[in-house]
């Protein structure tokens, strides 16, 4: 929830740990194109997995980088055997993507310029919001990537939620994301 970007060495350790236990790693990489201070790295990057995709799944979507939230269009990459199992299950669930969404997906995948434009839009919002929060006495932690700022004033998150709500600003309390978020709020760009 905080936008922290895991580096190559950290991800290598995750892969090594999982392989030692024959565990699947499913990496949500929907924000991969939205790094700000750090460039996110895929679990499938050769520096992370040495080119071996066994038990690794990278999950991608167009919802963030292409502004196609709720279209439910995305894909898996990685271990071919795991993907074959997922395709088999999906085939029997009767799920079908409507034709217009298929066409929108194809258009998005064939055009990289809109992603750069969308990223710039988010970057501009992030800069304005970051500066406004800091001016209001907040500290921004992590927030190296993604569409959120992880902000704190050093108080209980619910006090911050109330303070911001009084000013017409809606945020998510950090406690929604676990005890480590008790003094943070998640602010959407």
Name each model-derived stretch.
Residues 1-189:
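PLP-dependent class I/II
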